[in-house]
From Swiss-Prot:
Pfam families: TPR_1, TPR_16
Keyword Nucleotide-binding among record annotations: no
Organism classification: Eukaryota, Metazoa, Chordata, Craniata, Vertebrata
Basic and acidic residues compositional bias, start-end: 583-593
Residue ranges of the region described as Disordered: 1-20, 553-626, 639-873
Protein name as it appears in the record: Tetratricopeptide repeat protein 16
Key words, A-Z: Repeat, TPR repeat
Length: 873
């Protein structure tokens, strides 16, 4: 625009401008009338004449309006602004010209001038909403331009002003949020978003916006909540899906970090990481399962139970593996919680927790064991026993359950002892031994109970077992003094009672090891290794001079009874030649068969009897009551000490004759020294008797008999002492016995038998395995007729086929004592009949002998051996 145009505009604007008039002192009223008087010529001077402008201004305004519209159409924005400005100078109340000039300023990107003109227009016409909408639009454009120019604070002010003008439009608030985020004023932005969501809860974008803000602020649980709300409003929202995948990836990463920390033992850090994973993905049940496990390991049981229950609520039907894992962890949590209560002394709470666990799982042995421990501490021994039994039913070889059952049975046995119920106490101690056979104190307690029950043999065997397990066991010396008077530990361990105790103990331990051995190749290798070790131990025992045990094949091949080796104190020494033959046979049998079947059967029968009975017997047929009474009567005549124990054991068990013989051995009489002198006086007579009996017919008869007892006497002939030699040659034919019977009167026999009822020092240490049946005949002087001897010969044949193992043990247990009985007790049938008449047998004794004679359990040699044993005692 040129200067001439401006001057013309100024000239045109002159008439419409209000020119201020100078202030003058107003003339007083009536001054003109006072001056001019009554003349009316100058009276019209005071009247103000109106200006005539109505025609000029509207014409100019119309001109500027038309010219400004043309400029807008021609995009001449500056000229339009000038024309509209001139028109507004002519008439400032023209609202439309403000709006038109604002459009021209808007096209010139002068948002401030445009907004100012629109405000002026809106202020003049507030009822016109178009001006307000246009104003807010201009402000939006202005704020957006400032935002793009990174003038975030100015943009925030502009958007805030627009939001104030039109609060119903959220777009201005959204732009304010963007400006606050750009200014890193997150809390202010979060507050603004929260206020926005209070007004409008149907916009998924707002939830996603706040979810992103929460994720940025490391508040994943709030982020996931807003994301979940956004997906509910719009399940296919792409931004929501992208954010969800991002959160799942963050959760998996946190889960891996937690696993690494848990393996390293940093449980607290692992718990923090798994918490972060759950916050990122709270719908994954595996994360709660992991966190519950961490809680359980940190002994935060309430949180663990809550997480596991939440897992069970979250899993679906197709997630069976997850359900099993959650249930398993829940059971372990209950169990660990119960253990924690147990350590704190809250046993009742522990029982309640384990009850919850056992309602869902009945196949877990640990739960029963722990509940049994709680019951044990509460004093409910019956419930504790039931739980331990259930645990053993699930796992019979569980070491912890067997140990606990042993302790429980021990305590129950003590309770029964206090109530004077010694039989029940013995049963409890036997149960404890069955569950823990290597615990020495259980055998000691059972020995005391058996001693009170007058089961002396069982008590001795338990004491021998204690010596094998723990010779330094407290309170053992008193029982040894009572049960093994005058014997040292080595002497007790060298007896056959100790040998049987060792066999039983080895069998029980071996049974437990075999039952607990693993299956498959590993178990087979372990069994082979155990067998090899047994073979080496057996070979070592032969080298050390322990008693040799014949196998079933040797017993069948030779009816003779093997002797005990020189290392043992129970039997006589063998000749060197036979000893070498025995060792060769043993080595050959060891290669083919590591464990003899006969010995195993013996130990089996022994185990069965000792578990419930008080005396052991390897015989199938026991003695009758008449035989027992006769034995006891003859034994009373020998020693008062032996009477007490023998009678008590017989009254208690009425068992086999071998058990009674053992009881009699340990409680020997005190008259040994007194009778040794008398025995020495008779030693000269014995060689002559034995030499006369040593004829060819004797050997023939011995081989015809083929009894195991006869070989025992043959082996004994090789002994060095004259007494043993004569005793070993004691078996002769019937003619030799008749000759001896004619040469010796009945009085001489009685005199010889009387002083020989007490053994020498060598015989006192020998085995107690004696047979009491024929003792009655020898001591009662009721010698049997020839028919009875024939019947006994037949019975020996039956005995060899059925009880070969019994004969084996009989020979090992009573050899030296048999020699004396064989040396003096062989008589012919005629001599026996004459002696029976001369001695005046009673009808009772003859009936007892006739009943006892055809018994298939004993041969004549066995009876003589038993007689020698009781004489020794």
């Amino acid at each position: 625009m040129t200067d001439s145009d401006e001057d013309a505009l100024k000239v045109d604007q002159g008439p419409s401008r209000d020119i201020p008039k100078p202030w003058v002192i107003p003339a007083p009223k009536g001054i003109l009338q006072h001056i001019f008087g009554t003349s009316h010529v100058f009276q019209s001077i005071c009247d103000v004449k109106p200006k005539v402008t109505g025609l000029t201004v509207p014409l100019k305004v119309r001109e500027y309006y038309s010219r400004g519209q043309q400029c807008l159409e021609q995009a001449d924005w500056e000229t339009a602004v000038l024309l509209f400005s001139r028109a507004l100078h002519l008439d400032p109340q023209l609202v439309d010209f403000y709006a038109l000039r604002a459009e021209a300023y808007l096209q010139l990107c002068d948002f401030s001038s445009a907004a100012q003109n629109l405000r002026r227009a809106y202020s003049l016409q507030q009822d016109n909403c178009k001006h307000l909408e246009r104003l807010t639009f201009v402000l939006y454009l202005q704020g957006q331009c400032l935002f793009e120019q990174c003038a975030f604070l100015d943009a925030l002010n502009v958007f805030s002003h627009a939001a104030e003008l039109q609060p119903e439009k959220p777009c201005f608030r959204y732009r304010c949020m963007a400006c606050l985020l750009a200014l890193k004023q997150h809390q202010a932005c979060l507050t603004l978003i929260t206020n926005e969501l209070k007004q409008d809860t149907t916009n998924a974008d707002v939830y996603i916006f706040r979810a992103r803000l929460y994720n940025f602020l490391q508040k994943p649980h709030l982020c996931y909540r807003d994301l979940h709300s956004a997906l509910l409003l719009n399940p296919k929202h792409p931004q929501a899906r992208m954010l969800l995948q991002k959160m799942v990836a963050q959760a998996q990463q946190a889960r891996q970090d937690a696993g690494i920390l848990a393996v390293q033992g940093k449980l607290q850090h692992a718990l923090q990481r798994i918490n972060r994973a759950i916050e990122n993905n709270p719908l994954d049940p595996s994360l709660f399962l992991f966190r519950g496990t961490m809680y359980r390991r940190l002994q935060e049981f309430d949180g663990a139970v809550e997480d596991f229950l939440k897992v069970l609520d979250m899993v679906t039907e197709d997630q069976e593996d997850m359900v099993r894992q959650a249930q398993r962890q829940l059971l372990l949590t209950y169990n660990d919680f119960a253990v924690h209560c147990y350590r704190q002394g809250a046993y009742q709470e522990g029982v309640l927790l384990l009850n919850k666990a056992l309602r869902d799982e009945q196949q877990e042995k640990g739960l029963y064991i722990n509940r049994g421990d709680c019951f044990f501490q509460l004093g409910n021994l019956a419930f504790a026993e039931a739980d331990y039994q259930q645990a053993l039913a699930l796992s019979p070889q569980d070491e912890g359950a067997n140990t606990r059952m042993g302790l429980l049975q021990e305590k129950m046995g003590f309770c029964e002892q206090r109530r004077k119920q010694f039989q029940k106490a013995e049963n409890h101690f036997s149960t404890a031994i069955r569950h823990n056979p290597q615990k020495a104190q259980y055998y000691l307690y059972r020995a005391k109970s058996r001693q009170l029950l007058q089961n002396i043999f069982g008590a001795r065997q338990d004491v021998a077992t204690v010596l094998l397990l723990n010779p330094k066991q407290p309170k053992l010396s008193l029982l040894m003094t009572n049960l093994f008077p005058g014997m040292s530990v080595e002497e007790v361990l060298s007896t056959q009672i100790a040998h049987l105790a060792r066999l039983q103990l080895e069998q029980m331990v071996e049974g437990s090891l075999q039952a607990g051995s693993p299956q498959g190749i590993v178990g087979m290798l372990k069994r082979h290794e155990l067998e090899r070790q047994k073979a080496l131990a057996l070979q070592h025992s032969w080298k050390q001079g322990e008693p040799l045990i014949a196998t079933s094949e040797e017993l069948k091949a030779t009816p003779e009874i093997p002797q005990v080796k020189p290392g043992s104190s129970e039997g006589e020494a063998e000749a060197p030649e036979e000893e070498e033959e025995k060792e060769k046979e043993k080595k050959e049998e060891k290669k083919s068969e590591l464990i003899p079947s006969k010995v195993a059967s013996l130990s089996d029968s022994y185990l069965d009897q000792t578990s419930s009975a008080s005396s052991m017997s390897f015989r199938t047929t026991g003695t009758s009551e008449t035989e027992m009474s006769a034995i006891c009567q003859e034994y009373r005549s020998t020693s008062a000490t032996a009477v007490t124990f023998s009678d008590s054991s017989l009254l208690k068990t009425q068992s086999s004759d071998s058990g009674n013989n053992r009881e009699a051995l340990s409680h020997g009489p005190r008259k040994i020294k007194a009778t040794q002198g008398q025995r020495q006086s008779l030693s000269k007579t014995e060689p002559t008797q034995s030499q006369r009996r040593n004829s060819s017919k004797t050997k023939a008869t011995i081989h015809k008999r083929n009894s195991s007892k006869t070989k025992a006497t043959q082996s004994q002939r090789r002994n060095s002492s004259k007494t043993r030699a004569t005793q070993g040659q004691g078996q002769s034919s019937s003619k030799t016995e008749a000759t001896q019977g004619q040469r010796q009167s009945s009085s001489e026999i009685e005199a010889t038998q009387g002083p020989r009822q007490e053994p020498s020092k060598t015989k006192t240490t020998r085995s107690p395995r004696q047979r009491p049946r024929k003792v009655k005949a020898a001591r009662g002087r009721s010698w049997r007729p020839s028919k009875v001897d024939a019947t006994q010969g037949r019975s020996r044949g039956l005995l060899r086929s059925s009880t070969k193992t019994e004969a084996f043990y009989d020979s090992n247990w009573s050899l030296s004592k048999t020699e004396y009985a064989q040396g003096q007790g062989q008589r012919s049938s005629k001599a026996e009949g004459a002696q029976g008449k001369s001695q005046g047998m009673s009808s009772t004794s003859s009936k007892a002998e006739s009943t006892w004679g055809p018994s298939p359990s004993l041969s004549k040699t066995e009876v003589d051996q038993d007689l020698t044993y009781y004489e020794a005692v």
